[in-house]
Amino acid sequence: MLSNIDIKKKFERDGYIVLDLINKNFLLDIKSNLALLINNSYINNNIKINHNPNCLNSTINEGMINLESVDHKLLSNIYDTLPRSTFFLKLISSDSLTKKIKLLLNLKNKSNFYTNSVCMRMDVPGITKFNYGWHIDENTNITGSNFIQLWAPMFENATKKNGALEIIIQSHKLKLETNMTKSEQEKLGKINRSDYNKVKFINKKGEKLISKHIPVRIGQVILFKKNLYHRSGIINESKMRYAMTSFYHDISDKSFTYENMYNFA
């Protein structure tokens, strides 16, 4: 088990760290709620059920894939619901998570966070139009904010085959740009993501860029820097990929200014 000093050193060196921080009982509660929402969607919309509604894995995989094929809005409604549930909010604000994030941001224990980009990704195999290309969220989130990002698999260990997050090794130490960097910076603080297949690096200095998929087990999270280049993994199997994301902003930082990225009233 790494000491706090070693955790900080590794985070600064690599730009990310994988830690065991999630209570798996929380994940099971969310999985059960997800299955409930899926089965209710079938009933409420009079859709023929071809999966086993009494089996969680069948429901969240075959059941969700079929819902998406009937109408993407049915998946979208569930996508919008779960991250605002008390179970999910309890998960992203757990003491185990926030204490480590405070450690990495050099904050006091009583510091508070503003969270955004809180979601549970629900990626369907064979569909890539919702996958993000190479980007850093320093260019796309709150201007000048001091924040750390979280990515974690929900119900299956994350591997290259099932869409684990992909990074450019040591990119937090390189001043890299893509063909979309200027556009991202001009739209800073707004919803602004680039298509997976259209983003290319403009490698002016000729650095050798090496990408890596980060394997993550259930119960683990990736915490990474806002200037680490990353992109969505591609699913190469028949199951859904479910992953949680959240950004943790230090609201005590003088440069923090709230920006309404989502146009909520």
Regions from the PLM with identified roles:
Residues 1-13, 20-134, 140:
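Non-heme Fe(II)-dependent double-stranded beta-helix
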Residues 16, 145-151, 162, 211-213, ...:
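Extracellular structured ligand-interaction cores
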Residues 23-26, 120, 125, 139, ...:
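Short, solvent-exposed loop/turn segments at secondary-structure junctions
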Residues 40-52, 60, 64-69, 176-183, ...:
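Non-heme Fe(II)/2-oxoglutarate
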Residues 119, 134-136, 152-156, 169:
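Short, structured patches in soluble enzyme cores that scaffold and shape functional sites
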Residues 134-138, 151-152, 208-210, 228-230:
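Glycine-rich, charged/polar anion/phosphate-binding loops
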Residues 141-160, 215-218, 247-251:
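Short, conserved beta-strand element in jelly-roll/cupin
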Residues 160-229:
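Double-stranded beta-helix
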